[in-house]
């Protein structure tokens, strides 16, 4: 037996998992012996009673001896070169032959990768960090890399090593990234990182860059290949690249995939190759029900949205989250679509099918905060790595969550790359950034003494603002034609202005003021609305300060607020008429549109994340008629350019009359870009019809009634103008001509001059 080549204290550092670079000890090393170079192979094999080095090309085996520990093995081989060796181990009654992870010494991360990551500018860091199935030296396996700069040791845990952190200890690089290639494992492996801090405490963490996770309540990451899906949306992406979305119709159906519709547990799931088991809903309200899969949703949700005529689907957060009741807004797996509904490839299929049906996909993105779950980002390497250490900057007490440290380059890089990732790998068409105000203000939901000012003594979070600018600048550079939408509830200036003008760089901002004004106005008894005309007109005073999206979202139908129809006054007929009036005005008003699921058929109850929507209501005619109303409203909106091409230009909107508060009537003109086409909109916000209501119009001719929210097919009283009206040579509202109209109760009319009919009649 030859003499050992390693000191006991070095062996102990491996045995006790205390070495920052196990490659210094384990694997193969050239040494000088008797004046010549030989090779020593060392391995720590906790479950082995005996081991051999196998040279498959030479068909030779060399027995290994134990040194300083019964499971630490060493073997000296007299050869000038050593490569592609394997280890044969005896574990109980079984023998196995495998490649040694510590034989693969070359790091996959280059110095340039690490440099870019350290300065916060590696835009595709998700292709480097995380778990990646690859091939090294002709051997297939998985490369693992994780950023944990303050950890004492990091190991990979998984089924492949019986979740034993001693077996696959990682190497730490100069920038705090730990890495290891594990041969002969592949896609589908479950894994975590075992992280030990300098106090000896051990944390088991999911992979921050993991592409897939186990269904809750389990928390392991899963090795996944995101490059295997064959996309069929090239035409969609090419058209998007050359289209300005701000001049296009955007009508968004906001949906929570986990509660739109459920399936009975006995209903077979559409799953590819049986890869994923259906996930049961954890709710007593729906015992035995399960979530629909992404593929089932593709076959049910997409045709429904297409029938209704929406241009986009907006998904409440689909990144992995442990608690169903968070609606997805407490994310632990930023790079993993939730496994509640299937695999990453299943979600790709869903997006692909949306695009093939001419429906865009928007995703809610949550870069403002993250939960404290032990397997997630919180206290990741035994220190406050992703969050601020000081709770005055690092904690949202109202939500019980932690705040990202945007001043740390690597954290900012994690988030910036994450935004780009969803567009790159999943072909989404836009993000809605949640709770932007909570990011921008250091004193958000904090009392005096509970927050720290910025370097200038102000309450603005300058690092967060810079982060948002960086995200939006890169987003539109890499993916022209996409949407970045801010849910920003304050008067922070220039949210939807380009970054080169000093703006935050979003191209749309939710108009929270309009939403509050509208819901306040429509909840009033109509006879009192005359005293609150400003609710209707005020939005046009500031409309051109931002690119606004008008949104009636999930936030307005929860927490005791009731659903939209429940907010309306009057009997059932008036409630439905008010709903039609509200949405017809919304679609005629400048700005893009978003509405939450269930509003389209008049659900009475609040949204409940644990239950289906009230689909049985569609058995009843009033709810069928309301659904028909939204179908026709979307059809009109998409077909009439005057309603969307100049949403954000002053020349796209003119009041005809906004001062008739006595009757609670407003009228205005919407104009089409680069043409002389326009539509006239008249809104009557009371149940009192007007048989002779005159408004001024700019041109003489016949005005066709394109849309009447009071039509019988929508459940209305069917008051209208028999298809249209000729103008009178009677000036009104500073216009040379006027129309004598019949205004229906709680109704909205949209008219357009028929130029062909007018020309024939007037002989021009």
UniProtKB/Swiss-Prot annotation:
Keyword match Transferase: yes
GO molecular function: 1,4-alpha-glucan branching enzyme activity; cation binding; hydrolase activity, hydrolyzing O-glycosyl compounds
Pfam families referenced in this protein's UniProt entry, alphabetically: Alpha-amylase, Alpha-amylase_C, CBM_48, GlgB_N
Principal EC category: transferase
Keywords: Carbohydrate metabolism, Glycogen biosynthesis, Glycogen metabolism, Glycosyltransferase, Transferase
UniProt keyword annotation of Disulfide bond present: no
GO CC annotations, alphabetized: cytosol
Source taxon at top rank: Bacteria
GO biological process, one term: glycogen biosynthetic process
EC numbers on record: 2.4.1.18
UniProt pathway: Glycan biosynthesis; glycogen biosynthesis
Residues annotated as catalytic: 434, 487
Recorded catalytic activity of this chain's protein: Transfers a segment of a (1->4)-alpha-D-glucan chain to a primary hydroxy group in a similar glucan chain
Assembly behavior: Monomer.
Family: Belongs to the glycosyl hydrolase 13 family. GlgB subfamily.
Role noted for this protein: Catalyzes the formation of the alpha-1,6-glucosidic linkages in glycogen by scission of a 1,4-alpha-linked oligosaccharide from growing alpha-1,4-glucan chains and the subsequent attachment of the oligosaccharide to the alpha-1,6 position.
Protein name: 1,4-alpha-glucan branching enzyme GlgB
